[in-house]
């Protein structure tokens, strides 16, 4: 069951489109894109979340990421 969000789908899609646009404009390979996005997530957690909550947030994020990855053969 998907979780509801306090953010509108339009807001999320607009930000996603902008981020993808930056990566595409720079012709960023997949491995570098993942590295940069991972560093961004780490930075957000380390600078915006209290130390006591960081591990829990990171675990929740990792779980959500794993749950959203498709396992079909297409790429």
From Swiss-Prot:
Matching InterPro entries: UPF0352, YejL_sf
Pfam families: DUF1414
UniProt-listed SUPFAM superfamilies: YejL-like
Protein family (similarity comment): Belongs to the UPF0352 family.
Classification via HAMAP family: UPF0352
Name assigned to this protein: UPF0352 protein plu2871
The organism of origin for this protein: Photorhabdus laumondii subsp. laumondii (strain DSM 15139 / CIP 105565 / TT01)
């Amino acid at each position: 069951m998907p979780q509801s969000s306090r953010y509108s789908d339009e807001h999320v899609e607009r930000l996603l489109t902008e981020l993808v646009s930056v990566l595409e404009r720079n012709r960023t390979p997949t491995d570098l894109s993942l590295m940069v996005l991972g560093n961004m997530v780490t930075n957000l957690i380390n600078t915006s979340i209290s130390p006591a909550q960081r591990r829990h947030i990171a675990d929740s994020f990792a779980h959500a990421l794993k749950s959203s990855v498709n396992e079909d053969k297409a790429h």
